């Protein structure tokens, strides 16, 4: 059966959360989001519902891609297929389709993270031209983590705000998550 790509704008937060949870069923690690967690996480990361996709088999969701966007850079915040659709070469086809769409929308750079032991996903992303840049480690702490180091530069005043904007450039793509606020802020 052919899958149909549908922009995430066509779904509610509740539906997207349910689809994400279904697509991550039987994943390497448990992935379950509440609606509130979904909205908080992906909103903070700059989720673009316009660029994000759900692939349908008839009326049934088969796959999802959550894309966060900042200017001409995008981050694949989540990409998963429901278990019944895995291992059929669809991940490659859907990723090629998504990357082509992002390129048409002016995206020049795409970042993503993948669990090192997810050999199928690592092979998929490498076959699409992605290269390993950083190793990420996951930790859980009850203490506050130090802020992400970032570099600040000032750019000319924005006529909309009548004040200079401060552009924050993360020191490495992992700061996208640790510093999920927008890259430009009005300077007070």
Whereabouts are the PLM-identified features?
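Short hydrophobic beta-strand segments in globular cytosolic domains
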Residues: 62, 120, 131-133
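Conserved beta-strand-loop-alpha-helix junction that forms the acyl-donor binding cleft
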Residues: 82, 112-121, 139-143
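Conserved acetyl-CoA pyrophosphate-binding loop and the N-cap/start of the following alpha-helix
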Residues: 85, 89-97
């Amino acid at each position: 059966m052919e899958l149909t790509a549908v922009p995430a704008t066509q779904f509610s937060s509740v539906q997207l959360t349910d689809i994400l949870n279904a697509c991550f069923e039987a994943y390497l690690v448990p992935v379950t989001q509440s609606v509130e967690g979904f909205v908080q996480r992906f909103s903070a990361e700059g989720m673009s519902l316009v660029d994000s996709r759900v692939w349908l088999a008839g009326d049934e969701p088969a796959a999802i891609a959550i894309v966060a966007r900042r200017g001409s850079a995008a981050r694949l915040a989540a990409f998963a297929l429901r278990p019944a659709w895995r291992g059929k070469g669809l991940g490659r086809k859907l990723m090629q389709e998504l990357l082509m769409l992002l390129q048409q929308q002016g995206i020049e750079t795409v970042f993503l993270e993948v669990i090192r032991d997810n050999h199928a996903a690592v092979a998929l992303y490498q076959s699409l031209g992605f290269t390993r840049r950083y190793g990420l480690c996951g930790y859980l702490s009850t203490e506050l983590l130090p802020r992400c180091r970032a570099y600040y530069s000032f750019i000319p005043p924005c006529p909309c705000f009548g004040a200079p904007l401060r552009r924050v450039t993360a020191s490495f793509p992992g700061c996208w998550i640790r510093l999920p606020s927008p890259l430009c802020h009005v300077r007070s």
